[in-house]
Amino acid sequence: MSELTKEFTDQLYANYQASVKFAALENAITHNGIHAALETRKSAVENTPVFSLDLTKDKVTDQKASGRCWMFAALNTFRHKMIASFQLEDFELSQAHTFFWDKYEKSNWFLEQIIATADQDLTSRKVAFLLQTPQQDGGQWDMVVSLFEKYGVVPKSVYPESISSSNSRELNTYLNKLLRQDAQILRELLASGADQATVQSKKEELLQEIFNFLVMSLGLPPRTFSFSYRDKDNNFHTESGLTPQSFYKKYVDLQLEDYVSVINAPTADKPYGQSYTVEMLGNVVGSREVRYLNVPMERLKELAIAQMKAGETVWFGSDVGQVSNRKAGILATDVYDFEAGMDIQLTQDKAGRLDYAESLMTHAMVLTGVDLDEAGRSLKWKVENSWGCLLYTSPSP
C-alpha cells in the first residue's frame, strides 16, 4: 500500500496556492456553503413553472417526519381522480391507515423471513441483513398495491394522523426492538426442535403483541364508517355502512393489477425488455412480488407522457437528493455548477452511478404535468412531492 508522504502533501499545497481562482472560491464557499455559492442563475431563469400539460392544482400533502413518500404518492394519484370525479374542493385519503397495515404486514414478513433462515448462522449475510433493520417506513409500488388490495383505503377524516404516524422515529425504534426480540424467540424455538404448528402458534402470539403496540401508537383502524362530503356546488352527499375495501372499490375504482413499475437501469447486468425483482423485499406475505420492467429512458418518458395525456397522474421514484434546490423547487443537473465552480470533473454516467452505489431510488413522488416541445418531447416535468411542488428537467437518455 502507498502512504501519503509529506512531499506529496507539500506539492498539493503548492498546486492549490498557485491558483487565484481557488482563493476566490474558497472565500465564497466557506462563507456561503457549496450549494449557495455554486447555484446557477441560468437554471432558475430557464426552468419556469409553466407546463403545456398540467393535470392538477390540488393542494399538496405533507408526509412530515416519516418515510411514507411511496404511500403519499400512490394515495395522491387516487385523490386527484376523486377530486375531479366528485367535484371536491379538497380531499385526502388516510395515509395513516395504509401506514398501520404496512407496519403490521412488515412485521409478519420479517418473522416469516426469520423462520425461513433459521438454519443459517446469525453471521450469515441474509440473517445479518434482516436483523440490521427488521422494518422501516419505505416501500415500492407493488408493496402499496398489495396493501390497497387487501385492506382498502379510508378518508383521512375517518382515520387521521397521530404523533407516531407523522413522526415515526420512536415507533420504528420500539417496533424493531420487539421484532429483534421476537426473532431470537423464534430461532431458539426452532433450534430446540419445535414443530411447525408450535412455531406458527408462537408467531401469532407475538403478532398480537405487535398489533396491540401499533393500535396504541396509531389508533384502532375502522372496520366500518360513514362518508359525507359537499361538492363544489355545495350539494351534500353521504353514505354509511362502508368498509375500507368497499370504499376503495367504489370511490377509487382503478384496476391496479394492470399497472407495473417501469425503470431505467442502464447497467450491463440488466438488459432492457426484461423484468427484475429484489430478494427479501416486500411486505404482504402471499401477495404480488415487487417487480420492475427495465426500459430505455426515452421509452419511460413516452409511457409517462401517454399516461398523463390519458388524464392520469403518474407515481414515480427517483434519487431526489442528487441535484435539487428545495428553496426554488427545482431538480436539474445544471442547478449547481460544480465542475466550473470547483474544478471537479463529474463524468460518471448513470450505469456507473448505479453500479458503484452513488445512486439509487430514494423517494417517490407524482408527475402531474409536463412541458412538451413542438415534436412532443418532454422539456420539463411538474412534480407533486409530499414536501411541496417541484420542477424536474427532462432526463437525458
Question: Predicted segments — roles?
Answer:
Residues 2-22, 72-75, 88, 245:
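Bimodal feature
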Residues 6-55:
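N-terminal regions that are enriched for targeting/export leaders
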Residues 54-118, 122-230, 305, 309-310, ...:
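Active-site nucleophile-adjacent alpha helix/oxyanion-hole segment immediately C-terminal to the catalytic cysteine
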Residues 54-64, 130, 283-290, 348-352:
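Glycine- and acidic
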Residues 59, 68, 134, 290-294, ...:
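Hydrophobic alpha-helical scaffolding
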Residues 130-134, 168-172, 177-182, 186-189, ...:
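Active-site-adjacent substructure of cysteine-protease-like catalytic cores
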Residues 173-308, 320:
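Core regions of eukaryotic protease modules
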Residues 392-397:
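Conserved small/polar residues in nucleotide/adenosyl-binding loops
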